[in-house]
Amino acid sequence: MEGVDYKNFDAVVGKLRTFFRDVKGYKEVHTQNKLSILAACEDPQTIATYNYNGEVWPLPQTGQMWLEHYLLEHPDEKGFFCLSTSYRNEPNPVEGRHDKIFPMFEFELKGGIDELRKVEMELLDYLGFNKEGETMTYPQDDYDNVAAKYGVDELDHIHEEYMERDFGKAFFLEHFPLKTSPFWNMRLLDDKIHANKIDVIIHGIETIGSAERSIDKEQMKEMFNTISEGAYANTLFAQFGKERVQKELDAFLKKDFFQRSGGGIGMTRMIRAMKLSNLI
């Protein structure tokens, strides 16, 4: 039935807004009305499009790059957040895990991966996921270590389910290798083959996806053109024209960058997680 879970949606959004606005001091902005190619496309293989004012645009998948724009243009602010709708035309959706259209709560902040991890642990504490009497004590490990534990090269949704069994209800999976195709603006470690990325796995499902952003313009340009063996850039060029895409990329890379991070929270997944933990 339509709207059957509206009370839980209202409760969880209210808690997230209170944490980021009142506890952390971030500002809420609206990103859904922005026209963009790069800021909309996180996974070009799942893009759906619409025609507006004589041009083809992607239905937005994320508002995080727009939050970056806000933070880069207003560096006096502590951070920004938004409530958005993500359109993911998943070719092979997994029942119970993938919605093709779903609400997201997204945020951007000043600081690197350590600050990002701290804020996310504070958020989980605020929502009530911490063990009684404990704070900021969530298990964490690098992607490669966890993949080795399960005897695979790449982790998938089955392994996320194992993580709840092996590490508990909330687990921080960090430092993703380039073979997992992290977004092109993520900061790389010194080894240049891992990204400063954190997925927060709650009750066996990635519920928060986040990363530190790059400040290296040449690295971002190279990553844009080579990620997924060039398939990311070529898919965008084919759908929207190389000139339009390149113009957006060049405009973004002209900005004055500083250390920053951000992430997105899948609302249906967070509601699920809070239900399973009896928090709503």
Model-identified regions with their sequence ranges:
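Short amphipathic C-terminal alpha-helix that caps PH/PH-like domains
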Residues: 117-128
